[in-house]
UniProtKB/Swiss-Prot annotation:
This is Glycerol-3-phosphate acyltransferase. GO terms for cellular component: plasma membrane. Keywords: Acyltransferase, Cell inner membrane, Cell membrane, Lipid biosynthesis, Lipid metabolism, Membrane, Phospholipid biosynthesis, Phospholipid metabolism, Transferase. The gene is plsB. Its EC number is 2.3.1.15. Pfam families: Acyltransferase, GPAT_C. Belongs to the GPAT/DAPAT family.
Length: 827
């Protein structure tokens, strides 16, 4: 092909004719990011002989300014007539094809390298995808038109070009340096076989990452579930338990399978891509994506499970859209059965959603079918997505992980770990979430509403608002095998039993959930709305003049740059003034002018809503805010005291907010933050003692505002402890303490004018009490009553004096005493 001037002329004419219809693009700009050494020969390798594929590659190389594959290339003193070859050689005149044969071009290049006729040669694997979809056995439309795992014939390729040619994607992969392989001195033949094997594996993994594994039809998949031994056993037990025939029990299992299974359809994926492209451009100012390249690298050869945070219903669509646009297979998505609504449910199912009930309790047959469905997805290499938080976060915080799906994943992996599983955390950060008005009601205490198809019209009515930007950050992957090696060494050799439920499963699953939550928080995207919310909600009147607010924001940005939370955390562009203008443009800030300048404030509605956006990043500011709190009641504190009180309080902050640092790392991290405080003028250091600025200074005001970021959290801690101490030993249960804390917090919020409903969120008190139990500070007797360690008094009085103002401590103690006098604990 293209070996003579006449054939090159014909090829050029064919390419021009092809591009009268075809439109192509490189996946993630891969042609523009190749790191090629132009002084050394470059060869492109395609998997199968295809003139149309070659024409597309030639066009993309021309667009990117890369060496063209159809032009001659010098290899030492020898001139190769073209700079490409096929991994599977072209057929001979009789149509015969040696699929294991070695390309003559590759043979000659390796020979030249072995003879040192040339220093090196670069091999660039290139994949061309006509459309992007997994294959299905019985869908004639897709078998004819979409890229799949089947060998493509000329007629089928022609139809593919006509139907899918306007959605052609090209992936240029990292160059392979042949010199590195030749220098292994394995001889000509073995080196050629090694190169051939490397390329063959590469193309297989690349294809799986982009179009997905080879899949079977949904009906066949569901039928296959009921033939699994574990499901057959569950069917037999169901028949015996319910006194029905095996046929009826099997029919019920099939109904469960059809209720659960997705119906992944390429036409719907393409339809959603077109609709969502319009939607994102209509409603958002842009989508920022970070570290998707790392996902592309790890997707090859792994079973990928995406574990995003859950802030909005459009999380499902956004992640699938971005993966598809970046040349990765959209995942099969776990969705609550409440979303299986008329019209919407069918669309989501064809877009990759599979549906699950909120609880599996009391239905072992459903449990067996669901577990087997997930095991099938995992073992066949389908990417999967589920939300470890369970539901959407209404408060903006990372919710405590629901470990059900993680446990199913762990058990599936223990059953068969042929394909390594990797969890990919995905942080999705909104400057304004679509469901903001709904969340506003729920933040004010309204009950959670059931999803309805009519919610769509509410979203459409909100399109006139400005929603800013969305950031999607891919965090540090968690390889399940490595995690198990750390948590349970020797797990591969253990006898796990037929149900794959080792005794350590629950504890290990809980630790895995915490690891995922921390990795999600590490990938946080800090945006202007987060920072403005953090600053203004820390003021007593929810207001600052514009210059003061800009100074606060500049301080926060400087601190975050001095002590980065994690390599995966991203910061907004611009200074404090630019951030303010951005948030004003979204109508989240009110403004009042007077003779002295501008006052920026939050009205009542936005004040509640902005707690949601503050909470998105509270975990990042919790530790520096805690350190700043120590200086609200003390002018001078030694490093040793700072560390002692930090270590006393940090475990509870870490448990609530999923902060990344372990207790062993605190010394170094605290030193970094203290150094940053000194650099910004918030503290002075005298030997081993840190000194706060004068109370009348601007720096002390900034230090105070920072400390208030975590004030309500610390007040909740003190409330629970004060109530417990006043109740006495073995006098109150955890549930009773939760209720009392909630009532007390509601009363204090009225007394002190706190407009933050999460202040009396019962679940936060529940988790704090559990943390006290985990730390050994509390114990439960056989009746469930709580007793406390003597250290609790020290924690309450010693640390609380350092971080809470005297009037707040007095008010909390007074309310606790009033409760004891009015409602004595039951004996």
């Amino acid at each position: 092909m293209t070996r003579s001037p006449l054939r090159r002329l014909a090829f050029g004419a064919l390419r021009r004719l092809l591009y009268l219809w075809v439109r192509s693009e490189t996946i993630n700009q891969s042609a523009f990011t190749l790191k090629l050494d132009r002084s050394k020969p470059v060869f492109y390798v395609l998997q199968q002989p295809s003139v149309s594929d070659l024409a597309v590659v030639d066009r993309e190389c021309t667009k990117a300014g890369l060496p063209r594959p159809v032009l001659p290339v010098a290899v030492g003193e020898h001139i190769e007539p073209a700079a490409f070859f096929y991994l599977t050689p072209e057929p001979d005149w009789f149509g015969r094809q040696d699929k294991r044969g070695i390309s003559p071009t590759l043979d000659r290049v390796v020979t030249a390298l072995g003879q040192h006729a040339v220093d090196d040669a670069q091999i660039v694997p290139v994949s061309v995808f006509w459309g992007q979809s997994p294959d299905r056995e019985t869908s004639a439309w897709k078998l004819l038109f979409a890229d799949s795992w089947a060998v493509t014939g000329r007629l089928r390729r022609l139809v593919s070009i006509l139907i899918l040619g306007r959605k052609t994607r090209v992936q240029f992969s990292t160059p392979i340096h042949l010199r590195e392989l030749v220098e292994q001195d394995k001889g000509q033949e073995r080196t050629l076989r090694m190169v051939h094997r490397i390329l063959r594996v590469h193309f297989r993994n690349q294809k799986a990452a982009v179009i997905g594994p080879d899949v079977s039809h949904r009906r066949n998949l569901v039928k296959g579930l009921v033939h699994d031994p574990l499901v057959r056993q569950a069917i037999a037990e169901e028949a015996e338990r319910e006194k029905i025939s095996l046929e009826k029990a099997e029919a019920q299992a099939l109904r469960y399978g059809n209720e659960i299974a997705s119906d992944y359809t390429y036409t719907v994926i393409r339809f959603l891509e077109l609709v969502l492209s319009w939607f994102w451009n209509k409603i958002y100012d842009g989508i920022k994506v970070h570290n998707v390249e790392g996902v592309r690298d790890i997707a090859q050869g792994h079973e990928v499970i995406y574990v995003p945070c859950h802030r909005s219903h459009i999380d499902y669509l956004l992640l699938s859209y971005l993966l598809f646009r970046n040349g990765l297979t959209p995942p099969h998505i776990a969705a609550g059965i409440n979303l299986n609504m008329p019209v919407i449910g069918g669309l989501l199912r064809r877009g990759g959603a599979f549906f699950m009930r909120r609880t599996f309790k009391g239905n072992p047959l459903y449990t067996a079918v669901f577990n087997e469905y997930l095991h099938t997805l995992f073992s066949k290499g389908f990417p999967v997505e589920y939300f470890v938080e369970g539901g959407r976060s209404r408060t903006g915080r990372m919710l405590r992980p629901k470990t059900g799906m993680l446990a199913i994943t762990l058990r599936s992996f223990l059953r068969s770990h042929r394909l390594p599983i990797v969890f990919v955390p995905v942080y999705i950060g909104y400057e304004r979430v679509l469901e903001g008005r709904t969340y506003l009601g729920e933040l004010r205490g309204a009950s959670k509403k059931k999803e309805s198809i009519f919610d769509l019209f509410k979203v459409l009515g909100a399109l006139k608002q400005r929603f800013g930007q969305v950031s999607v950050n891919f965090g540090e992957p968690i390889k399940l095998a490595e995690f198990l090696d750390q948590q349970q060494p020797g797990w591969r050799q253990q006898e796990l039993g037929p149900q794959y439920r080792p005794a350590w499963l629950n504890d290990t699953t809980n630790r895995l959930g915490e690891r995922v939550a921390r990795h999600l928080n590490e990938a946080a995207s800090i945006n202007p709305v987060n920072l403005v919310a953090l600053a203004l909600l820390s003021t007593s009147k929810l207001a600052l003049d514009d210059r003061a607010l800009a100074r606060v924001l500049d301080l926060y940005l400087a601190l975050l740059r001095a002590v980065p939370y994690s390599p995966h955390t991203t910061l907004p562009d611009g200074d404090g003034a630019a951030l303010i203008e951005h948030v004003k443009g979204m109508d989240l800030l009110a403004e009042q002018k007077d003779a002295l300048g501008k006052i920026l404030y939050l009205d009542e509605q936005n004040a509640v809503l902005m707690t949601y956006y503050r909470n998105n990043v509270l975990h990042i500011f919790a530790l520096p805010a805690l350190l700043a709190s120590f200086f609200q009641s003390s002018a001078r504190i030694s490093r040793e005291q700072i560390l002692r009180f930090t270590k006393a309080l940090y475990p509870y902050l870490q448990a609530e907010l999923f902060i990344r640092w372990e207790i062993e790392q605190l010394d170094d991290v605290v030193d970094q933050w203290l150094a940053a405080f000194v650099e910004q003028g918030l503290l002075k250091v005298e030997g081993d003692v840190y000194v706060r600025p004068a109370p009348s200074s601007r720096q002390f005001v900034l230090l105070t505002l920072l400390s208030r970021s975590v004030a309500q959290t610390l007040q909740r801690f003190y409330m629970a402890i004060a109530l417990l101490l006043n109740a006495g030993q073995n006098a109150i249960s955890a549930e009773e303490l939760e209720d009392l804390c909630t009532v007390m917090a509601q009363r204090l919020s009225i007394l002190h004018g706190l407009n933050a409903p999460e202040f009396f969120d019962k679940s936060l008190f529940r988790h704090f009490i559990q943390s006290l139990l985990d730390q050994g500070v509390l114990r439960q007797d056989e009746a469930g009553k709580l007793s406390h360690h003597p250290l609790l008094s020290e924690l309450a009085e010693g640390a609380a004096k350092r971080v809470l103002p005297a009037e707040i401590r007095l008010s909390i103690r007074q309310v606790a005493l009033d409760r004891n006098e009015d409602e004595p604990a039951a004996p």
